[in-house]
């Protein structure tokens, strides 16, 4: 017993200690497990007294990087949990300054473990977390936490002082994700300075030596898979307001809209290691509704010293309204004075559906032609998420006017993370003509956003182009020919950025030296500059458009007339009959080198004679005593030395002759005061009338010249095949009037029947008339007055589906004019149609106008026909497509610029004002003379057609934005003595309705009066009813204030009473051109 007692006592003493130890182990089992798991790590780092555990609410894992060590990547909103365990000593956990008020920290004495937990982690929480031993600060472990939302760069102080730069400067473009060095680039004053030594925890470090160039602006750029972001930093010459904190905004919702409860928080965060929030300071707000705060609509919540290094204040807005939009300023004040402020623009959408632009490539881009490609991109988000449509467009100014074209259109499918999207336009094959304003329109539900870019593609070598705007030309063997005396309108166009002037020169045939041509006006586009010239063609010449060493050449040849074959008969007949002698003349232009002409009929060559004039070659073919076998196709073939052929053909038809024969025995019943011979023949016979054996008259129909027409009448018809006679006795004495009563009854019955037919078949007749009208349009060859015809076929037809008709832009008595767009070419046109589609009379007026316009050759000062839609004319649809002139009519143009008019005739003229003013809103004396010269040129062209305008006035003249005029409504005006037109009409037109080119000259003189009175009314002191009397008394309009004396002398010449004493338009043009040159030289 004595031997066991000591042992039992020892066990009794040890048992309580053993039980306490077991309980301790059970309570801290999990820490032992963790400790056991980390023992290998500790063993790898035997000198470390602490080690770091971490875990997250998701399955993210710890990763390692050679440069930054251990790290983890999280997404904003997740929860971060960290554990720091020590073998001995008191733990110390350090973390980024931003986290002081949101960290849940707990320390457990067993195993010396410190816990850190952060819920709803934010992008701004990115930073390094470290575990340190208080006894041995050198012993530590750390991990870097990246928290990403949408931006790749963390907010940071953006202004640094030169004082900050001592041995080195850190540009703190820290990232929220681990990035590779080559993905981040550093630019100093726009130049790339670093791309390799980037640390995502700190940014770029620049030594004092690297700062030798002393840049003032740094930019960090992130580029990866069409995703680009950047952040800027400024080096200030002045001392910063404060260099230990940053000020930034945080909003609660990226898509604020009407009705939403919105919050906006301003944070002041101290970033220096020893920086503390000051005790005497506050964050103040300025905003659209900050002063009113009605009904608790807007509440400001202030939090001072939230944590040691942070101040925060928030604005809460209930039921957001449009009036809440605007600038919100957060002002950091210390001791009552503002030290720094930051601004936030709040955009409140009226609808829930929104398109928010997040990022875009630079809005102004310059590139070199041929350098590759330019990418335009925009990053944006739509709310709520859904499909949207986008349209890429380009607008630019061409030398002919504004252009708007669709580059790309469709449903987007480019989606990024966080419900964001990106659109990219790759502009390849760079050249100057790819320049302009590019627009991206994003359409989503009932809202849209548009983004703009300016793209300028510069070229070291401008392109040049020579354009001759003269449609009355033709080609033979590739040579361009124009008629002698043609007024050539030549455009010398240079394509480049920046714009440069092109020079036009010409060289006459057999001359070696080029001569410079004086330019008339300049028109600029986005990447084109057009310099226009006018040349009267008198002989063959070579034209050269030149910019430096870049040259465009064009050889212009003169011809007396367009190649053609003419008929000439020995006798004056409209057809060719057996026995006639026919002369065929083939007219072709004179060509350099040796050329031969051959006539071919039924594959056989025919003998002919030739003649050469200064500008033409003529070949004559005579067919004597023609027979019907001579009918057929005759071809004139021109062959050059290269064995190339140019041919013209015509069809000759020889009619057989027929002796005169009686169509109807005896005379037809008298029709009014005429009798018909009723004898026909081929060729048409000559007729001789006899009364009672005495010659009485000629012609097929005989007119009565006596009241008593009784007698025996004979008609003798004779042609080359023979003759025939028809006779009849006419008695008029004692005639009964019963026949007239019978005829009256018969006529009344016919009228009743016709009335019934008209009332029952009105629709049929209208359709028939419209069909006949259409046939007359297609088949008519008498387009022009005086029988002159330019075109035999109507070849301007467009399909109605190719035209989009828009808003009305004008109207007249017979028609209405609307703006339209040709869908294929996006060309803007003016569309004219009848005011009443069901009116045959109105449609006929439009048809006649179309016929005339289609036959008038184009001229830069005469409104040109673009085309027509006639296929549905049978159903009352007829549209004339004309040039669209964007400046309106000349009278309104002049009246609207009276306040800005520059009178260059007086001494107070400012010599610094340029003579050439392309601005459409400006107006000067030189402009007025130039406009008058253009009208004279246009009217001279119409007079040479010939075509009488009949209603010339400034209302009938259109003007473009480049101050080029077009004469309109020519030849189809309502030539009636109307009060609205009498002030412009010549006296013979008012009194006798006599219209001619001379009456147009009178109206041109009135136009000059309108121009130099800036849209004034002619005869301002005379009532309309007395105009004719006023003119006959010798009264004329007085000289306008702004009119040069030489041009008033021209007006008086135009207003001479005898029409033959008035000048031709060619003289008017010449006199005005001289005045224009004198005016230019004088200034």
From Swiss-Prot:
Location(s) in or outside the cell: Cell membrane
Q: Which UniProt keywords apply?
A: ATP-binding, Cell membrane, Disulfide bond, Glycoprotein, Immunoglobulin domain, Membrane, Nucleotide-binding, Receptor, Repeat, Transmembrane, Transmembrane helix
- Identify the residues that the record assigns to the Protein kinase domain, covering every copy: 803-1076
UniProt xrefs under Pfam families: Ig_2 (PF13895), Ig_3 (PF13927), PK_Tyr_Ser-Thr (PF07714)
Q: Which residues form the Ig-like C2-type domain?
A: 563-647, 656-731
List the GO biological process terms: cell surface receptor protein tyrosine kinase signaling pathway; nematode male tail tip morphogenesis
Domain of life, source organism: Eukaryota
Protein name per its UniProtKB record: Protein ver-1
Native organism: Caenorhabditis elegans
């Amino acid at each position: 017993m004595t031997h066991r007692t000591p042992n039992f006592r020892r066990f009794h003493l040890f048992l309580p200690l053993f039980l306490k130890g077991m309980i301790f182990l059970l309570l801290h089992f999990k820490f032992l497990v963790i400790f056991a798991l980390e023992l290998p790590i500790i063993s790898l780092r035997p000198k470390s007294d602490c080690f770091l555990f971490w875990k997250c609410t998701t399955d993210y894992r710890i990763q390692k990087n050679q440069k930054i060590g251990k790290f983890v990547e999280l997404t904003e909103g997740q929860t971060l949990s960290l554990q720091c365990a020590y073998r001995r000593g008191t733990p110390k956990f350090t973390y980024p300054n931003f986290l002081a008020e949101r960290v849940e920290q707990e320390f457990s004495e067993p195993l010396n473990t410190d816990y850190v937990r952060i819920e709803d982690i934010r992008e701004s929480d990115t930073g390094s977390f470290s575990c340190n031993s208080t006894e041995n600060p050198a012993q530590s472990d750390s991990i870097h936490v990246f928290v990403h939302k949408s931006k790749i760069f963390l907010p940071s102080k953006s202004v640094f002082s030169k004082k900050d730069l001592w041995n080195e400067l850190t540009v703190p473009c820290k990232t929220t994700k681990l990035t590779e060095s080559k993905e981040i680039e550093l630019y100093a004053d726009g130049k790339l300075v670093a791309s390799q030594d980037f640390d995502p925890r700190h940014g770029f470090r620049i030594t004092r030596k690297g700062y030798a160039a002393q840049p003032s602006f740094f930019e960090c750029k992130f580029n990866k898979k069409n995703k680009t972001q950047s952040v800027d930093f400024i080096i200030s010459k002045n001392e910063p307001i404060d260099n230990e904190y940053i000020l930034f905004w945080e909003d609660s919702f990226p898509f604020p809209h009407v009705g939403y409860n919105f919050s906006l928080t301003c944070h002041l965060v101290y970033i220096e290691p020893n920086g503390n929030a000051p005790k005497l300071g506050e964050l103040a707000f300025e905003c659209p509704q900050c002063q009113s705060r009605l009904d608790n609509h807007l509440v400001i919540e202030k939090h001072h010293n939230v944590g040691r290094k942070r101040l925060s204040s928030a604005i809460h807005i209930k039921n957001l309204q449009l009036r809440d939009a605007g600038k919100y300023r957060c002002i950091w004040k210390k001791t009552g004075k503002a030290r720094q402020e930051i601004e936030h623009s709040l955009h409140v959408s009226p609808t829930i559906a929104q398109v928010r632009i997040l990022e875009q490539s630079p809005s102004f881009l310059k590139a070199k032609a041929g350098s590759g490609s330019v990418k335009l991109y925009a990053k944006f988000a739509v709310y709520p998420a859904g499909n949207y449509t986008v349209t890429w467009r380009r607008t630019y100014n061409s030398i002919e006017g504004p252009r708007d074209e669709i580059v790309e259109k469709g449903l987007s499918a480019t989606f990024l993370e966080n419900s964001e999207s990106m659109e990219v336009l790759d502009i390849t094959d760079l050249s100057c003509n790819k320049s302009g304003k590019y627009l991206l329109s994003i359409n989503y539900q009932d809202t849209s956003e548009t983004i703009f870019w300016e793209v300028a593609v510069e070229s070291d070598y401008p392109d040049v182009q020579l354009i001759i705007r003269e449609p009355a030309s033709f080609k033979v063997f590739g040579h361009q020919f124009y008629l002698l005396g043609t007024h050539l309108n030549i455009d010398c166009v240079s394509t480049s950025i920046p714009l440069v002037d092109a020079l036009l020169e010409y060289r006459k045939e057999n001359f070696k030296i080029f001569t410079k041509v004086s330019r008339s006006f300049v028109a600029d586009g986005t990447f084109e500059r057009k310099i226009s010239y006018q040349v009267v063609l008198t002989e063959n010449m070579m034209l050269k458009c030149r910019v430096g060493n870049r040259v465009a050449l064009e050889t212009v040849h003169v011809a007396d007339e367009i190649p053609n074959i003419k008929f000439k008969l020995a006798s004056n007949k409209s057809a060719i009959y057996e026995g006639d002698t026919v002369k065929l003349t083939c007219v072709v232009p004179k060509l350099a080198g040796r050329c031969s002409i051959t006539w071919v009929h039924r594959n056989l060559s025919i003998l002919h004679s030739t003649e050469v004039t200064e500008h033409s070659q003529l070949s004559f073919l005579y067919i004597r005593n023609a027979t019907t076998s001579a009918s057929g196709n005759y071809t004139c073939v021109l062959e050059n030395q290269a064995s190339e052929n140019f041919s013209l053909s015509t069809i000759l038809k020889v009619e057989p002759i027929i002796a005169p024969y009686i169509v109807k025995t005896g005379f037809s019943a008298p029709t009014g005061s005429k009798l018909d011979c009723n004898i026909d023949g081929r060729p048409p016979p000559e007729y001789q009338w006899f009364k009672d054996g005495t010659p009485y008259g000629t012609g097929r129909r005989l007119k009565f010249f006596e009241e008593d027409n009784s007698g025996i009448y004979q008609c003798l018809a004779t042609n080359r095949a023979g003759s025939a006679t028809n006779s009849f006795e006419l008695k008029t004495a004692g005639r009964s009037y019963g026949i007239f009563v019978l005829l009256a009854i018969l006529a009344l019955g016919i009228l009743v029947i016709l009335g019934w037919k008209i009332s029952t078949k009105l629709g049929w007749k209208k359709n028939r008339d419209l069909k006949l009208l259409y046939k007359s349009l297609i088949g008519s060859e008498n387009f022009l007055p005086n029988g002159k015809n330019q075109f035999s076929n109507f070849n301007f037809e467009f399909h109605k589906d190719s035209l989009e008709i828009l808003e009305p832009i004008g109207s007249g008595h017979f028609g209405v004019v609307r703006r339209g767009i040709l869908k294929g070419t996006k060309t803007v046109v003016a569309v004219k149609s009848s005011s009443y589609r069901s009116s045959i009379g109105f449609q006929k007026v439009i048809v006649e106008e179309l016929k005339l316009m289609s036959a008038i050759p184009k001229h830069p000062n005469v409104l040109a026909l673009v085309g027509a839609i006639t296929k549905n004319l049978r159903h009352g649809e007829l549209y004339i497509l004309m040039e669209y002139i964007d400046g309106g009519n000349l009278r309104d143009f002049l009246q609207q610029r009276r306040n800005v008019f520059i009178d260059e005739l007086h001494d107070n003229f400012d010599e610094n004002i340029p003579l050439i003013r392309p601005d459409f809103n400006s107006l000067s004396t030189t402009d007025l003379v130039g406009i008058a010269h253009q009208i004279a040129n246009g009217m001279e062209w119409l007079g040479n057609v010939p075509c009488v305008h009949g209603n010339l006035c400034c209302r009938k003249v259109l003007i473009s934005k480049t101050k080029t005029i077009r004469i309109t409504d020519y030849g189809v005006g309502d030539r009636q003595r109307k009060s609205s037109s009498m002030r412009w009409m010549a006296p013979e037109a008012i009194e006798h309705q006599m219209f001619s080119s001379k009456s147009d000259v009178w109206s041109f003189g009135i136009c000059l009066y309108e121009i130099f009175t800036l849209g004034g009314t002619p005869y301002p002191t005379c009532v309309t009813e007395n105009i004719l009397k006023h003119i006959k008394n010798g009264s004329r309009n007085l000289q306008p204030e702004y009119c040069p004396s030489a041009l008033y002398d021209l007006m008086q010449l135009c207003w001479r009473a005898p029409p033959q004493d008035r000048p031709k338009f060619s003289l008017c043009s010449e006199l005005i051109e001289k005045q224009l040159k004198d005016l230019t030289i004088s200034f």
